[in-house]
């Protein structure tokens, strides 16, 4: 079967669908069948994490389809409306921070955390994370879990990773985000709102937070081998630290931008205009990216197996 299409010069040429399909198929790099079982478990950890929010949405929609569950759904929606735990420090579930899933995610890339200095637990800190990348996986593994033993490295520091307020509007997923994971000291995923930040930094000594400074806008610059940051209009975290007497800890994750490939979107292009318009109305930007698959190395939505190393340095205010 063939299709007649114009070429770049405007002339008509035939395109053989079979040849196109064969060309694409030959370009796919399939994973071997004899991959060691631990690596399969690592891949499964990433798949589960990637599908976490879609599964929560699907579970909510399924619950809506059963009439006998509607009272419970209504009660949960009311609870979502009146509950502001994401602005008050989260809720504690002690075992979740050390859940084996996070170790699988850590080893998949791998992701590591380098300690360069001690932090005084009697003070408060504002961690500024760079770069955002596509999803900030380095921030999640190193600072929202105990996969790399953050609490052991920085004893007495009660760190909370912050995310967009809109993420707490997804049913069921919000409960996972709100879990405080540390068995010894509380740690929860919280809102990045001003109220949330002030509440955390005024809870007492050691209470600290991490902000992914570049936010959604920075994800549009996340290309492998690049280190472009969005900082010029993102100085609110410095004012936050000064207002609350906290010290700044800039953190950079080398390799964060290498985890996915992104469709080129130079400023002024149609793709970038669409992304900026989408961000204006939805508060987050939709990067058009691809990675690897479960059984392929170069096509899919999973991140590539590329190393991420997070390094920080204390700055006193």
Question: What are the roles of these predicted feature ranges?
Answer:
Residues 104-312, 316:
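Soluble catalytic domains of membrane acyltransferases
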């Amino acid at each position: 079967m063939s299709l007649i299409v114009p070429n770049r010069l405007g002339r008509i040429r035939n395109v053989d669908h079979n040849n196109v399909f064969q060309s694409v198929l030959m370009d796919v790099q399939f994973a071997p069948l004899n991959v060691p079982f631990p690596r399969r478990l690592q891949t499964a950890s990433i798949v589960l994490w990637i599908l976490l929010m879609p599964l929560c949405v699907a579970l909510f929609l399924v619950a809506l389809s059963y009439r006998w569950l509607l009272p419970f759904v209504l009660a949960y929606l009311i609870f979502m409306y009146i509950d502001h735990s994401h602005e008050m420090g989260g809720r504690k579930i002690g075992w979740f921070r050390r859940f084996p899933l996070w170790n699988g995610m850590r080893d998949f890339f791998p992701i590591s955390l380098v300690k360069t200095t001690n932090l005084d637990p009697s003070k408060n800190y504002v961690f500024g994370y760079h770069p955002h990348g596509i999803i900030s996986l380095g921030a999640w593994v190193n600072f929202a879990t105990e996969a790399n033993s953050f609490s052991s490295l920085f004893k007495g520091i009660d760190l909370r990773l912050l995310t967009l307020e809109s993420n707490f509007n997804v049913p069921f997923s919000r409960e996972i985000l709100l879990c405080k994971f540390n068995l010894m000291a509380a740690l929860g995923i919280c809102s990045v709102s001003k109220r949330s930040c002030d509440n955390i930094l005024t809870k007492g000594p050691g209470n600290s937070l991490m902000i992914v400074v570049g936010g959604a806008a920075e994800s549009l610059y996340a290309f492998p081998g690049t280190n472009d940051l969005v900082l010029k209009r993102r100085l609110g975290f410095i004012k936050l630290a000064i207002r609350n007497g906290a010290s700044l800890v800039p953190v950079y994750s080398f390799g964060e931008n290498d985890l996915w490939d992104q469709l080129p979107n130079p400023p002024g292009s149609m793709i970038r205009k669409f992304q900026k318009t989408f961000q204006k109305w939805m508060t987050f930007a939709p990067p058009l990216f691809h990675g690897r698959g479960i059984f392929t190395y170069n096509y899919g939505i999973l991140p590539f197996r590329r190393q991420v190393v997070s390094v920080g340095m204390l700055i006193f205010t």
